[in-house]
UniProtKB/Swiss-Prot annotation:
This is Carbohydrate deacetylase. HAMAP family: COD (MF_01246). Belongs to the YdjC deacetylase family. It is an enzyme of class 3 (hydrolase). InterPro entries: COD_ChbG_bac (IPR022948), Glyco_hydro/deAcase_b/a-brl (IPR011330), YdjC-like (IPR006879). Homodimer. GO terms for molecular function: deacetylase activity; hydrolase activity, acting on carbon-nitrogen (but not peptide) bonds, in linear amides; metal ion binding. It comes from Vibrio campbellii (strain ATCC BAA-1116). Gene3D superfamilies: Glycoside hydrolase/deacetylase. Its cofactor is Mg(2+).
Length: 251
């Protein structure tokens, strides 16, 4: 089985960026997704250019910061996106507003000269029932996978699964290995969501999920994790292992 450890939130803060790069250089992270238009975006670009083997996708924002398009349908009444807890209650998203914002974020990424690996979203916003069909269309437009568990269909030989078990109280080396071993007989490729970081004051001020990111970083850079993955016949990979199927993920 192949395992994609994808680090979310690249570009959120410099501490997050530094943690992701450590997890890449010293650990098992070969894939990350970048938040466009956030404070540490340029820092992330500099690090990306220094680490060409790190595959990077877009971590679409619909619950953090301001829309690049400024479209009022996407905000909570001010300049910022709707809050996370309000996103799931909202049922009046305008399809064109969502589409234009997603395209704006992807185009901003491409303008930086970075190859686009795949698409996912902050707080899993793309799984909102009104956003999902639009974001799936955007992924198909750019011919990249979209994070989710519906990647492979009847005519696809590769089975894929996304897991968010490595989060919060689920962060441990023993826990992630036990979970992966339980999936090995069912899937060819498993994506593990992760959030490594060197916690900085900026992160503490904007995120309710901060301190455990350092524990994630410890696990992801542990030599024991690499050893156990190898012992159980698991290899680390990135989204390029899925692109060759010419299928697009959905949830």
């Amino acid at each position: 089985m192949k395992v994609i450890f994808n680090a979310d939130d690249f570009g959120l803060t410099q501490g997050v960026n530094n943690g992701i790069i450590k997890a890449h250089q010293q650990g098992v992270v070969l894939s990350t997704t970048m938040m466009m238009g956030m404070d540490a975006e340029q820092h992330a670009v500099e690090l990306a250019n220094q680490n060409p083997n790190l595959k990077i996708g877009v971590h679409l924002r619909f619950t953090a910061g301001n829309p690049l398009t400024g479209h009022p349908n996407l905000t909570g009444g001010g300049e910022q996106f709707v809050r996370f807890n309000e996103l799931w209650k909202k049922r009046d998203f305008q399809e064109e507003a969502v589409y234009q914002e997603a395209v704006a974020q992807v185009e901003r990424f491409l303008s930086l000269g970075l190859p686009l690996s795949h698409i996912d979203s902050h707080h899993h916003a793309h799984t909102h029932p009104q956003l999902l069909p639009v974001i799936r269309r955007v992924a198909e437009q750019y011919r990249v996978p979209l994070r989710g568990s519906g990647l492979c269909h009847i005519d696809c030989d590769t089975t894929y699964h996304f897991t968010d078990e490595f989060y919060d109280q689920g962060v441990s080396l023993d826990g992630v290995m036990a979970h992966l071993k339980s999936l090995k007989s069912q899937y060819d490729v498993v994506e593990v969501m992760c959030h490594p970081a060197d916690v900085d004051q900026h992160l503490l001020s904007i995120s309710g999920y901060a301190l455990l990111r350092e524990l994630e970083l410890q696990v992801l850079t542990s030599p024991i994790l690499k050893q156990e993955l190898a012992e159980h016949g698991m290899s680390i990979t990135d989204y390029s292992t899925l692109i060759s199927t010419r299928k697009f993920a959905s949830v």
